[in-house]
Amino acid sequence: MKITVVCVGKIKEKYLTMAIEEYSKRLSRYCKLEIIELADEKTPDNASPAEELQIKKKEGERILKNIKDNAYVIALAIEGKMLSSEELADKMQLLGVNGESHLAFVIGGSLGLDSEVLDRADFKLSFSKMTFPHQVMRTILLEQVYRGFRIMSGEPYHK
């Protein structure tokens, strides 16, 4: 299975980069992982709602250009469906059984995802009703995908 993570924003913190590298290495046993890091738009502190929409639209266009037509798209969104680790593993396994060989997870920038990206998504996944920094979310996502593959393989994982 191929897993693509399309994300807006650069990781600047070394500890997050190290965690992402570690989970990328661990995932290499289970899938072909590609992380596509896209530039984020600068958001003024006092941005109007119209400016925020324009920023999300620009970031959304970049995201959509980097999603392959054959990918099953999972957008990370607060309004999405919350799953347990086991349920995420089941979903990934069922998608694989049903012939989906390419999953693309999408993480938006600080303002979230544009409506066109959400419309393109085959599934909207929420990790929490809380908001997380998008840089931290990348690490959390990779850990959960790794945990999902461990569960699917019947290997032990920390509960």
UniProtKB/Swiss-Prot annotation:
The keyword S-adenosyl-L-methionine is assigned to this record: yes
Domain of life (superkingdom): Bacteria
Protein EC: 2.1.1.177
Chief location of this protein within or outside the cell: cytoplasm
Positions annotated to bind S-adenosyl-L-methionine: L76, G108, F127, S128, K129, M130, T131, F132
Record field: catalytic activity: pseudouridine(1915) in 23S rRNA + S-adenosyl-L-methionine = N(3)-methylpseudouridine(1915) in 23S rRNA + S-adenosyl-L-homocysteine + H(+)
Subunit structure of this chain's protein: Homodimer.
Family to which this protein belongs: Belongs to the RNA methyltransferase RlmH family.
Protein name: Ribosomal RNA large subunit methyltransferase H
Taxonomic classification: Bacteria, Bacillati, Bacillota, Clostridia, Lachnospirales
Encoding gene, per UniProt annotation: rlmH
